[in-house]
A protein has these predicted regions:
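Reverse-transcriptase-like RNA-dependent polymerase core
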Residues: 66-69, 95-119, 129, 133-142, ...
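Conserved polymerase palm-domain catalytic core
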Residues: 97, 149-153, 158-161, 165-324
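Histidine-centered nuclease catalytic patch
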Residues: 515-548, 554-565
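A conserved non-catalytic segment of reverse transcriptases
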Residues: 215, 224, 307-382
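Extended C-terminal regions of large enzymes
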Residues: 399-495
């Protein structure tokens, strides 16, 4: 054993991984993605294929793909080979092994997870780490094409888009009293039935690689099963493939029913046809029930049939907006006073409270602090999801239901104690509100402190600003737009506000472009020194605050802005 080995010296491969210049890697990949998007926009498909090949064979692309699969939530979940890449040495070896020639994917490992109803199970196919990295690599080259050609109002599994955008588009499409009917579309086993032949003929990527993935099969209980159709849920590239299959439906409807064109069949009225899709869930608005059932539904069925898909006859229904419908966990309905309101759906509330009850029921032997630490992330996640709609009354009901279950938990935990003792032990008055559930713990310095239950009703309700339907994160034209959205998102979160304050202190309150004060009156804009479309990171090392006018000038004149020098004595974190 050498001296270096004895003291645990870092290997050459580990040194190689730690020495990677990630800003340069991101910049190289982003530049190619921007060029791919531009070539797609121009319809230069030969150039698209050449640039995709350049990206999938590049060192930067391979390194970024390996980093993605070793840093995401599934990094500790192995495939059929039971291998995970948890050391720098394995990551470097993985980069070197990512080659097209001789590549043969292994079967997927089939597992089952419960669906939202809690009764049925959803199959997932888990690829090996190598296959995941290969998919991540080819997704880097496919995603700019998919984003450029995607339907404008498709919101699922796309960068810079969310469920909140889809819900807000529902409101925009239905707020007019002229739009009264909705087709609720449900595609039967969408991911499991997409035609392989259609995907191979239409997905703009290396077809030989795609065919190997589609035909790789899966292992279940040590038995190999072939796959003849569908894209496995669990693969990194699967959401992009399903979006490829379903994109085009909105364009088809717009060609058939152009905006601003009256229909004779409707007595010269506008059809008011709009599609809002999130993955395989979609709704289509229309003027009349007859239009949706007699014309649009057959058109959708024909579109899906070519892709090996079909609508579920029992779950695909036409509903009047006054009856309301559920979409992505929200209920959309126009009430008798003419107002269109979106609220958390009863199903979503019931499912959430059932999970809370199970957590509390299983925590009889835990302390109040441990229980709060389990419940708070669940409450925060559910409330943040619904905080963009009319949720205040439902949040209060949820708070009461949780309080009632916590009181039962306290009584079961201390059956011989009277209610006054229980209240003093677990509940207190805080911020003007009584009966705040709390637990006692110690901070890092060993001092006693309290943790408190999060109340859903304390989450502020704020209207979501929908992303522009045509905005493309791979198009430099929208760089300023996405910077502004990110700034608004930061201001909307406690952590983000701290970051803005830190940047302000770091710059001594000065704009680096004009060297004058940034104040609330002057306003500010968040700027990336290295643009995001060129691979710049979101870290504070790549961000500065500029005046709005200075920000416009920097982008218009393409002026380079660098980070200001730190003030003497460093920067205090806000």
């Amino acid at each position: 054993m050498t001296t270096a080995q004895a003291v645990g010296a870092v290997s050459s491969e580990a040194t190689q991984w730690y020495a990677i210049d990630w800003p340069t890697i991101n910049r190289n990949v982003r530049r190619l993605q921007v060029r791919i998007a531009q070539a797609t926009k121009e319809g230069s498909w030969g150039k698209v294929r050449a640039l995709q090949r350049l990206l999938t064979h590049s060192y930067s692309g391979k390194v970024l793909a390996v980093r993605r699969v070793t840093e995401n939530t599934g990094k500790k979940t192995p495939g059929v080979d039971q291998e995970i890449w948890n050391t720098p040495e394995k990551k470097v070896q993985a980069v070197q092994a990512l080659k097209r020639r001789g590549y043969q994917p292994q079967p997927l490992r089939r597992v089952y997870i419960p669906k939202s109803d809690g009764k049925t199970m959803r199959p997932l196919g888990i690829p090996t780490m190598k296959d995941r990295a290969q998919q991540a690599l080819y997704l880097l080259a496919l995603d700019p094409v998919v984003e450029t050609t995607a339907d404008k109002n498709s919101y699922g599994f796309r960068p810079q888009r969310s469920c909140a955008d889809a819900i807000e588009q529902c409101f925009l499409a239905l707020k007019s009293a002229k739009t009264a009917w909705i087709l609720e579309g449900d595609i039967k086993s969408c991911f499991d039935r997409i035609s392989h032949n259609w995907l191979l003929a239409h997905v703009p990527m290396d077809r030989a690689i795609l065919q190997k993935w589609l035909k790789s099969g899966y292992m279940e209980k040590h038995v190999f099963h072939e796959t003849t159709d569908g894209t496995p849920q669990g693969g990194i590239i699967s959401p992009a493939l399903s979006n490829c299959a379903l994109d085009g439906l909105e364009r088809l409807l717009k060609e058939k029913y152009p905006t601003g064109t009256r229909l004779r069949s409707l007595g010269g009225k506008y059809p008011s046809v709009n599609l809002i899709r999130y993955a395989d869930d979609f709704v289509i608005t229309g003027k009349t029930k007859e239009l949706l059932e007699g014309e649009i539904k057959p058109l959708v069925e024909q579109f899906l049939r070519a892709r090996g898909l079909e609508l579920s006859p029992t779950k695909t229904i036409v509903t009047h907006v006054t009856q309301g419908f559920d979409f992505l966990g929200q209920n959309v309905r126009r009430y008798s006073n003419g107002k269109l309101l979106i609220k958390p759906s009863k199903k979503s509330v019931k499912h959430f409270l059932a999970g809370i009850r199970e957590t509390i029921k299983a925590a009889l032997g835990k302390s109040a602090t441990d229980l709060i630490n389990e419940l708070n992330p669940k409450i925060r996640g559910w409330a943040n999801y619904h905080r963009h709609v009319v949720s205040k009354r439902m949040f209060n009901r949820v708070d009461y239901s949780i309080f009632y279950k916590l009181w039962q938990w306290a009584r079961r935990r201390h059956p011989n104690k009277d209610p006054r003792w229980l209240k003093q032990k677990y509940f207190e008055r805080h911020r003007g509100r009584d009966w705040f559930f709390f637990g006692e713990t110690w901070d890092e310095e060993g001092q006693p402190t309290k943790v408190r239950m999060l109340l859903a009703s304390r989450i502020p309700i704020k209207r979501h600003v929908k992303v522009r339907s045509e905005a493309n994160p791979y198009d430099p034209v929208y760089e300023t737009y996405f910077e502004k959205r990110e700034e608004n998102h930061m201001l909307d979160t406690f952590r983000g506000t701290r970051t803005l304050r830190f940047l302000w202190y770091e710059q001594c309150g000065l704009c680096p472009a004009c060297n004058t004060k940034i104040t609330r009156i002057t306003g500010w804009r968040l700027h990336h020194c290295v643009p995001r479309v060129m691979g710049g990171s979101r870290s504070v090392e790549n961000r500065v605050l500029l005046h709005p006018e200075c920000h416009n000038r920097v982008h218009d004149q393409r002026i380079a802005v660098s980070k200001p020098r730190l003030p003497s004595g460093g920067v205090r974190r806000a």
